[in-house]
């Protein structure tokens, strides 16, 4: 019998936030050591529960979730996301057809990079980073290239460093705003500068906005897609943090900006969504 081993493409893929770090923490807890876990954004672990009406709504409509849906997600859910983008986030022209629902943003990050990257493509990622972005880029045989976020400047992106890191292999810029792990919220001026870089170099912006409704000090949050309607921006969000529903796995990615020229990518994303049949339905009926 041949030995069962992993594929070589996993050789440099790491995700220790849920790997060795968590395993060691669990070992310490088993030995009676008090461990405060700051590595995973899981509100339930801190007794931050979902609003009761969310559970009531799910129970009321649970039977409706027994069958498959459109691979992009239920139309009513996609329309709700589109309305949120247009009315709350001021992103122009978003319709339900621009929305892909997923089993959390994590699944959609991997699906998006699978559809987007060729071997050797470079993706600019903020440092410090949320490690899933690095892991998924490497898994898809891309190359993560890190741009600095300076603590002395309230962890804002170093625009000059972003410009220095661009090559003819650069495909996209990852923006995590509000930022995980630093907590920084980028002002409009920084977002406009990043959008201008994407405009100049024909880059796609991948904007992870998972924490946009978990802002404790009242600062405003702006979606970069609202400031740059002429730039293709994939905007990621979900209910894990805003509604404290991490375990329900409700996320979405919205293809914002010009529709012309994105048709092939949308078809590719639809193909990948179809291969997993559909996202979980019970939380979005």
Where do the PLM segments sit?
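Conserved core segment of the aminotransferase class I/II
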Residues: 55, 226-285
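N-terminal small-domain helix-loop-helix segment of the aminotransferase-like
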Residues: 4, 11-104, 111
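Hydrophobic "anchor" residues on beta-strands that sit immediately upstream
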Residues: 122, 172, 204-205, 234
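Residue-level marker for buried hydrophobic side chains located in beta-strands
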Residues: 177, 205-206
């Amino acid at each position: 019998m041949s030995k069962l081993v992993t594929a070589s493409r996993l050789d440099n893929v790491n995700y220790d936030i849920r790997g060795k770090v968590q395993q060691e923490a669990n070992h310490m807890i088993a030995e009676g050591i008090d461990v405060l876990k700051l590595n995973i954004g899981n509100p339930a672990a801190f007794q931050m529960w979902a609003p009761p009406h969310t559970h009531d709504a799910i129970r009321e409509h649970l039977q409706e979730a027994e069958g498959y849906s459109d691979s992009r997600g239920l139309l009513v859910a996609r329309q709700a996301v589109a309305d949120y983008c247009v009315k709350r986030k001021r992103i122009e022209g978003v319709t339900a057809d621009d929305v892909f629902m997923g089993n959390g943003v994590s699944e959609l990050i991997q699906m998006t990079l699978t559809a987007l990257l060729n071997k050797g493509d470079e993706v600019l990622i903020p440092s410090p980073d949320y490690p899933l972005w690095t892991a998924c880029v490497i898994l898809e045989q891309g190359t993560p290239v890190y741009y600095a976020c300076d603590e002395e400047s309230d962890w804002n992106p170093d625009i000059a460093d972003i410009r220095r890191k661009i090559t003819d292999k650069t495909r996209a810029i990852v923006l995590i705003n509000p930022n995980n792990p630093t907590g920084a919220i980028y002002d409009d001026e920084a977002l406009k500068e990043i959008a201008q870089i994407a405009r100049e170099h024909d880059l796609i912006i991948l904007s992870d906005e998972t924490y946009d409704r978990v802002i404790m000090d009242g600062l405003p949050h702006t979606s970069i897609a609202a400031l740059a309607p002429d730039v293709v921006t994939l905007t990621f969000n979900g209910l894990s943090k805003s509604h404290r529903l991490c375990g329900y796995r409700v996320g979405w990615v919205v293809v914002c900006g010009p529709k012309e020229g994105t048709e092939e990518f949308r078809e590719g994303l639809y193909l990948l969504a179809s291969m997993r049949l559909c996202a979980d339905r019970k939380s979005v009926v």
